[in-house]
Amino acid sequence: MGGMFPSAASAPGAANNLLNFLRAEDAALLAPHLKPFSSKPNAVLYHHGDHVGTVYFPCGATLVSFLISMEDGGTVETTMVGREGAVGGIVSQGKLPAFSQIMVQFGGEFLAMPVEALDAAKAKSRSLDNLFSRYADCLMAQMFQSTACNAAHGIEQRAAKWIIAAVDRTGELEVPLTQERLASMLGVGRSYISRIIQRMKRDGILSVRRGKLKIHDPKQLAARSCGCNDAVKAHFELILQGIYPADTDGCQTPLRASSGT
């Protein structure tokens, strides 16, 4: 249904899979309210306690993170959302203040609409309400899996999982991520991440340049990871088949290295 939406969703490779999954009549309910929105990395869409008034649909390689602030002033990521989903009032329906900070991890394009408009559309369409309820289930499952992963798996497994999840959602084999940022996302010291990245470089899995990680061997990277990302994928396929990004499909870019590399 990408052609019914504004330019951010209709441009090749810049789709949002959740919106493209809509039935034509449901897409028609949302289309008048969706507006293109661009953001640079590190922009905060919501702070803890903010009123949630807008739903954001990441498009293409745009990626956002849910962050929890810690007592020492640092932040730890609980989950990430890309073109497979949306953020802002999805679970609480916008009636409650934001608990986590929602930050743009990889900048790019969004489609945005008022929470009230989405709620009104869901009230008119049982199928639309059902779709977003199922997506909320997938989002919560991802958060639960992240909690278990942080408790049960080692730093290298979690680091590999994070990179794989970012590649899945962006469709890019070059991830704009510094080692310091990855350490912050995982809630660990940078020295741990530096040693892990050095081992991966030595083994030909990835290389580092200009604040980016370029993946050369996704299969080896997956072998270093835990199974948590696969568990999230499997749940998406069970609840919302076709939403979670595949290597290629008709509404998103193929898995590839970025241009100019």
Predicted regions: what they are:
Residues 105-107, 122-189:
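Polybasic "coupling" helices that flank or enter modular domains
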Residues 79-137, 141, 145:
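Cyclic-nucleotide recognition modules
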Residues 164-261:
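Phosphate-/nucleic-acid-contacting segments
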Residues 62, 108-110, 212:
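Structural motif
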Residues 1-40, 86, 91-93:
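Cyclic nucleotide-binding regulatory module and flanking cytosolic helices
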Residues 43-106:
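Cyclic nucleotide-binding regulatory domains
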Residues 25, 60, 85, 116-117, ...:
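Alpha-helix/helix-capping structural signal
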Residues 22, 58, 81-82, 105, ...:
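A conserved hydrophobic position in a structured secondary element of the catalytic/binding core
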